[in-house]
Amino acid sequence: MTTSDHRRPRVLVSTDIGGTDPDDFQSMVHLLLYADVLDLEGLLSSPYGDGRAADIHQVIDCYERDFDQLHRHAHYPQPDALRALVKQGAIDRADHHGRTGTTEGSDWIIQRARVEDERVLDVLVWGGLDDLAQALHDAPDIADRLRVHYIGGPNTMWSVNAYSYLEAHHPTLTMIESNSTYRGFFEPDPDDPHPVDNEQFVREHVAGHGALGDFFAAQLPRVKMGDSPTLTWLLHGERTPEAPSWGGRFVPLWADRRRYFTRLTTAADQVEVNAVLEIAPPLPEGYGATDHAHLLVDGREQGPCPDGVAQAGSITFRLSVYRLGEVPYRVRSTHPGLDGLEGAFTSVPPSPEKAATPSADHPHWWTDDPDPAQAIGRALGARWVSRYRSEFLGDFAQRLRRCLPGA
């Protein structure tokens, strides 16, 4: 999917809104204020924590309170039309095979993908990939009708099984994987002499601008909106991953990112950040059907704690990390031969040299530009977004003014 397309986009959003980060609420406000230029086809709740479809309805309630003002501008959908698009997706993370079981959300992806329409269905993933993976388990024929824009990084850490399934079993899927490019939405461009201040923007252009503006400001007193580059990529630019746009510029995915070890690793073992890692030491004698094991990674008691899957004489732990540097881990198990074992690995950035050779297996998969000149700190590719901050935030401010009386 590399040709430019300026038709009105068909958009389905999968979000972990209401879960671990309030910025999804901000991005949902952002999305609804641009609903007049999109064909919205689905709003899926795919939470890691406590978030549910009710959290999406909460934002639509604010939209309804502002609708008399928004309706002065053509093509805004009725609030009830938006409510009909809200579906509950997976509550639990995908298993080792990338499956959650069919959900209302995964089934809705299939239904919308099979609609007779020449346009691709843009699936914007603001959380885990679990519902998308389940949809492709159930209906692999829809893959070539989708264009996925995924905010990865921490989300891959949580939904590594779904990610692993898509990468391995649907390599020709059209995918934009933004592991750090998205950070340019809230990280000021180091070359901008007058960068937009995130807190000042909310005070001056968001708070007091209708129910949507007040709701946005109540979530965080500053701009974050880490999922919004998936939207702004559609609003400005050629809608081709390699072209600059408000949502970033991306490069083809390269080969050999995944690592597999048949032993516990050490800090001398290097693993590419955000890639899939599988650690598969031998099963100890006497490990039975009632035994279980998981990894405590980097001291993260809150998780995720990858479960060990026993098969073919080994026990496999699958994980992904988004932090650079040495990452320690410890095995917790009911079996004394595993419990307490420790290891580590070192998470490293991709090299521009390795990234110069695209993966032959993933012809339509794109990711962050590894060129250090386009990074902000360690956030690869972030400058491709941050250079447009004054433009897309200025445009957002104009949209927020539509919520004011008489606007």
Locations of regions flagged by a protein language model:
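N-terminal acidic, glycine/proline-rich low-complexity segments
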Residues: 1-407
